[in-house]
């Protein structure tokens, strides 16, 4: 099966178009890019710009970045508790949760309150979801009847990055399982064909023996 998914770096690149609030410490007219016009920039006045531009300005020490509302200790703790309560599904996370939080943790740690707690909570949330996914896959495979092929599974509230992380191993495992099932079916068909041939040979042998016995009886009767 051809792999048509995106690389993690490509998914992260797309997430960098998400708008985020920054507080500039410089004055400048609007910046014009192919993707749009951003500005003007006035010191101490918050402005929304793409994440990629915010990170670039942050690296130049031209602004502070305001993390999204959901990126606080209390809100992430609530998300983690909610994720644990749901056994058979997944909670809805903010769009590009993994990518945005990773980029902010790496590029503006001084702008994030309780950064160590947030980093741990983020990892706990994603690990819990990964564990639940693994359990769901095992449950699905165990529920299949003999000879039933594995095609697709539907997961709600799953991000592109999470799907990307499990896609390759999942598709590979499904292909291997289908090969095993097809091999078993071929073996069963071959066994059935062999049994059928053996039955035909036995029937032919019995018919020949019956004909021979009938001929002998006919000759004996004539004598």
Curated annotation (Swiss-Prot):
It is found in: Nucleus. Belongs to the GINS2/PSF2 family. Keywords: DNA replication, Nucleus. Residues 179-223 are annotated as: Disordered. The GINS complex plays an essential role in the initiation of DNA replication. Residues 181-216 have a biased composition (Low complexity). This is Probable DNA replication complex GINS protein PSF2. The keyword Metal-binding does not apply. Component of the GINS complex which is a heterotetramer of gins1, gins2, gins3 and gins4. GO terms for cellular component: GINS complex. It comes from Dictyostelium discoideum. Coiled coil: none annotated. It comes from the Eukaryota. GO terms for molecular function: 3'-5' DNA helicase activity. It holds the Pfam family Sld5. Its main location: nucleus. One of its GO terms (biological process) is double-strand break repair via break-induced replication.
């Amino acid at each position: 099966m051809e792999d048509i998914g995106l690389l993690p770096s490509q998914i992260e690149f797309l997430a960098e178009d998400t708008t985020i609030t920054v507080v500039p410490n410089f004055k400048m007219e609007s910046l014009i890019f192919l993707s749009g016009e951003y500005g003007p920039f006035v010191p101490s006045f918050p402005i929304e710009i793409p994440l990629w531009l915010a990170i670039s300005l942050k690296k130049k020490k031209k602004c502070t970045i305001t993390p999204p509302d959901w990126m606080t200790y209390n809100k992430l703790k609530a998300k983690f508790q909610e994720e644990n309560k749901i056994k058979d599904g997944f909670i809805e996370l903010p769009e590009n949760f993994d990518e945005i939080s990773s980029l902010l943790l790496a590029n503006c740690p001084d702008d994030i309150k309780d950064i160590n707690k947030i980093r741990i909570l983020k990892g706990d949330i994603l690990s819990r979801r990964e564990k639940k996914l693994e359990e769901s896959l095992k449950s699905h495979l165990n529920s299949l009847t003999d000879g039933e092929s594995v095609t697709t599974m539907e997961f709600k509230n799953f991000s592109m990055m999470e799907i990307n992380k499990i896609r390759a191993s999942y598709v590979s495992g499904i292909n291997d399982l289908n090969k095993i099932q097809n091999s078993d079916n071929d073996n069963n068909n071959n066994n059935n064909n062999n049994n059928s041939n053996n039955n035909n040979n036995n029937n032919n042998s019995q018919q020949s023996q019956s004909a021979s016995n009938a001929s002998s009886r006919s000759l004996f009767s004539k004598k």
